[in-house]
Amino acid sequence: MKILFSIFAGVLGTAAFLQAQHYHQPFFTEQQLHLEAAAAKTRAPFFSAIKPYRLSALRPIINPDSVLGVKPYRGKFARSWTGRKLFSEDLIRIAFPQGQILVNPAFDFTMGRDFAGNKTLWTNTRGVTVRGNLGKMFSFYSDFYENQAALPQYLSDVADTMGIIPGQGRSKPFKSVGYDYAWANGYVVFAPAQWVDIEFGIGKNFIGDGYRSLLLSDVAFNYPYLKINTQFWRFKYTNLWGEFQDIRPSLAGDNLNT
């Protein structure tokens, strides 16, 4: 996910985010582990067990870009109009007296090799992100991704049998070599005071530390949720409601409410 995150980092790192600091750090498990370890070393008050992290909570104690080794591209192309729009500026910025709307592309292309199955693996992702704020109390974020991928055999077996890719949603065959799938997530945050905020969205949440969680993991597909965060001094209380769905084509009508 190097390319995808590099573009995210450039977008979220612009001065615009300072006007409304309710955006999440992009939620990739491997990166969360590095950020979690770096935050723990600072011994600063930080609630690491509830993810995704807020940028407003991370940036006072660590620099996420430095921890993850993100280095902005500084070549000649980066100084051109196209390069600036890809690496350091927002592609589209609509500003108005009480806020702004920012639109940016997101790309990812990775390749690998499954030696046991003698198979070349790859993922091709194209997407768009939209974020903005209305005054100091309202922030919003949304993204959409279209993907094609050649998967390792154990994931191909799941996709062929159930019609889904774990954590990625429904899939359909892509030519004869892979699978096609798409997903979206987003959220709206209302922060009436410094010590409380209300967030409604569709996405993933994680409760716990480390790679896996028995309480709430990020393995499930995106789901609608309502979250209320209340914080006073070193105490933080989170209320979380969500609705999980079994999205297998044959069981799409069966919901599990929590």
Where are these regions (language model features)?
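Outer-membrane beta-barrel channel domains
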Residues: H22-T258
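Bacterial Sec-dependent N-terminal signal peptides
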Residues: M1-H24
